[in-house]
């Protein structure tokens, strides 16, 4: 709402000085999505549109200006949830962390070449077993999903609980990779 008010007040000031009320504004993008279960649920594109429309109407009414045509660039909130990347498990390695705890490293057939975001700036994702139902008796194990590249930073999912019976050949799904996964891939 604050950004809408700032843009419309600037539009009003420019019109007062120059005599021309800009007929269109672009409110940009940056509308978030949830990448993991720990992320807050983001508003839908429709909810964002309603909030922006109300802010435009209210601010224009306050200023006595004709409302402009409004453009937005919702990119990530539309594209992000639209893609799930599937990886095949190629290896497993259990590492003792001390005090009776361990982490299972789950190697996959992809990595930083198809999703650089975790390595580049620490973007967080989650992973789910997609190829079969796990054995409920196997419980969950703390895992780190790592890529196929010979780089210490090739981590796709830093910490995720996966079924204890995960095996080579299983398929993992990494949701919400549609916004930048493919466009930043090499």
Language-model segments: what does each one mean?
Residues 1-93:
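Active-site loop/helix belt of alpha/beta enzymes
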Residues 51, 57-61, 65-186:
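Charged (often Lys/Glu-rich) extended helix/loop segments that serve as interaction or gating elements
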């Amino acid at each position: 709402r604050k950004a809408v008010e700032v843009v419309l007040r600037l539009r009003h000031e420019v019109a007062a000085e120059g005599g021309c009320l800009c007929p269109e504004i672009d409110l940009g993008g940056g509308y978030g999505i949830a990448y993991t279960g720990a992320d807050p649920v983001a508003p839908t594109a429709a909810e964002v549109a309603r909030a922006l429309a109300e802010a435009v109407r209210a601010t224009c009414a306050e200023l006595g200006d004709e409302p402009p045509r409004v453009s937005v660039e919702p990119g990530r909130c539309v594209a992000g949830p639209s893609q799930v990347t599937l990886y095949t498990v190629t290896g497993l390695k259990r590492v003792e962390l001390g005090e009776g705890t361990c982490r299972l490293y789950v190697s996959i057939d992809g990595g930083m070449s198809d999703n650089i975001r975790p390595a580049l700036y620490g973007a967080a994702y989650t992973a789910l077993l997609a190829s079969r139902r796990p054995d409920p008796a196997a419980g969950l194990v703390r895992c780190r999903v790592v890529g196929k590249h010979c780089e210490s930073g090739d981590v796709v999912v830093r910490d995720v609980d996966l079924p204890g019976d995960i095996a080579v050949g299983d398929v993992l799904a990494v949701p919400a990779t549609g916004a930048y996964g493919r466009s930043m891939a090499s």
